[in-house]
Amino acid sequence: MIVIVTGMPGSGKSRIVEEFEKRGFPSVSLGDIVREETVKRGLELTKENVAKVSIRLRQELGQNAVAKLAVGKVRVLLEKSPLVVIDGVRSLDEVGTFRGAFPEEKIIIVAVHTPPRLRFERLKARGRHDDPQTWEDFEERDWKELRFGIGGVIAMADHMLINDGSKEEYEKKVKTLVEKIIRGLNRGGA
């Protein structure tokens, strides 16, 4: 089984990935693949360079470039684990790449929705080097994500978590969903 986790930046995707990892299931981050490719190309890991490499990869290999690069890693992990989580899928082309590469695997899409203002505040507080510090930067980043096609992936989700309350409420939702998916794995569904 493959679980694809998607959502806008700052929505709470990584918390879902962490919950699966805590239970022994491995993950592949498409963002990490772009960062690795940036380093391979001899570039410094800056927001601008990572964005340029992401665009260049898609120009060189197609809109599903990052997914194509991830397929080998996912395949290796599926040999050792009945469930692999893929974090950061941003387009239906990427979903299609995984469906095509793994026709024998059940693929579940989990999307997280968090209101924009709340995501902006969380990203500012998180303070990662590539997190926006102004509302204008935040909106620009959101529009880039939407142009990549993330809205289509969110719309096709099998499960949608709404993250608009307290941290404790979201934790409970995440654990409940992860348990449901794992139970489905053991029964052949979800």
Curated annotation (Swiss-Prot):
List positions binding ATP: G7, M8, P9, G10, S11, G12, K13, S14
For molecular function, the Gene Ontology terms on record are: ATP binding
Q: Which InterPro entries match?
A: NTP_hydrolase-rel, P-loop_NTPase
Q: Does the keyword Nucleotide-binding apply?
A: yes
Question: Per its UniProt record, what SUPFAM superfamilies does this chain match?
Answer: P-loop containing nucleoside triphosphate hydrolases
Task: List UniProt keywords, sorted A-Z.
Answer: ATP-binding, Nucleotide-binding
Q: Which Pfam families match?
A: AAA_17 (PF13207)
Its family remark reads: Belongs to the UPF0200 family.
Q: Which PANTHER family match?
A: DEPHOSPHO-COA KINASE (PTHR41930:SF1), UPF0200 PROTEIN MJ1399 (PTHR41930)
The UniProt entry, under HAMAP family, shows:
UPF0200
* Name this polypeptide is given: UPF0200 protein TGAM_0868
